[in-house]
């Protein structure tokens, strides 16, 4: 099987970002959504990014942010990739001069290929667990059998992943990448270096 990339999301501390990079994570994610327990401000995110080694992609997660708010963040924080995790239309995701991905919360009956075509400009589609009223970070996995074997966009699998189940998830879904947050934490927003290492080891062994 081809190399499966990984993102550690919900980074709030420099030491957690460095632990992710040291363990071999391809990307780290910053949550710019005030209602999240993993939210960061622009000063936090910028300070963390300045300490990162090269070749670690920085991702900003946004939930129905205004264009003005997002542009203000991008003026300060050097993000490589944008992740839209709310109800954004394809038009809402365009115009920032950054590559972007769109998160979808998966429910039975969803036409994921139609969504891939709808968000034609996305570099990939992130599949997360649907919980009413919660845009993400639920810590719950969804039914992976809902993911078709072949989709026209690279798939990033999220939702309730941990070192214990990511190998099975990769074997079943065969995603382009996996995304973890709560599965490598000791508390919300506080990562656990040993859990990050265990998760990355499981990804590499899958």
From Swiss-Prot:
S-S pairs: none
Matches recorded under HAMAP family: PRAI
A Pfam family annotated for this UniProt entry: PRAI
Record protein name field: N-(5'-phosphoribosyl)anthranilate isomerase
Enzyme nomenclature, EC number: 5.3.1.24
Similarity comment text for this entry: Belongs to the TrpF family.
Pathway: Amino-acid biosynthesis; L-tryptophan biosynthesis; L-tryptophan from chorismate: step 3/5
InterPro entries: Aldolase_TIM (IPR013785), PRAI_dom (IPR001240), RibuloseP-bd_barrel (IPR011060), TrpF_fam (IPR044643)
Catalysed reactions listed for this entry: N-(5-phospho-beta-D-ribosyl)anthranilate = 1-(2-carboxyphenylamino)-1-deoxy-D-ribulose 5-phosphate
GO terms under biological process: L-tryptophan biosynthetic process
Matches recorded under Gene3D superfamilies: Aldolase class I
GO molecular function: phosphoribosylanthranilate isomerase activity
Keyword tags: Amino-acid biosynthesis, Aromatic amino acid biosynthesis, Isomerase, Tryptophan biosynthesis
Amino-acid biosynthesis is among the record's keywords: yes
């Amino acid at each position: 099987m081809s190399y499966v990339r990984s993102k550690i999301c919900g980074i709030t501390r420099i030491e957690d970002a460095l632990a992710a990079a040291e363990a071999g994570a391809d990307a780290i994610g910053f949550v710019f959504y005030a209602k999240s327990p993993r939210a960061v401000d622009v000063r936090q995110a910028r300070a963390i990014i300045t300490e990162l080694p090269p070749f670690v992609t920085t991702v900003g997660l946004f939930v129905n942010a205004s264009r003005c708010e997002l542009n203000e963040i991008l003026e300060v924080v050097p993000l490589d990739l944008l992740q839209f995790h709310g109800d954004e239309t394809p038009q809402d995701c365009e115009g920032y001069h950054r590559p972007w991905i769109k998160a979808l919360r998966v429910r039975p009956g969803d036409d994921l290929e139609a969504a891939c075509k709808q968000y034609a400009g996305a570099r990939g589609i992130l599949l997360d667990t649907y919980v009413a009223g919660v845009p993400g970070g639920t810590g719950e996995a969804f039914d992976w059998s809902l993911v078709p074997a072949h989709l026209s966009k690279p798939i990033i699998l999220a939702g309730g992943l941990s070192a214990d189940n990511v190998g099975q998830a990769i074997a079943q879904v065969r995603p382009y990448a996996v995304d973890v947050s709560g599965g490598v934490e000791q508390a919300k927003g506080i990562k656990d270096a040993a859990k990050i290492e265990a998760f990355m080891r499981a990804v590499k062994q899958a």
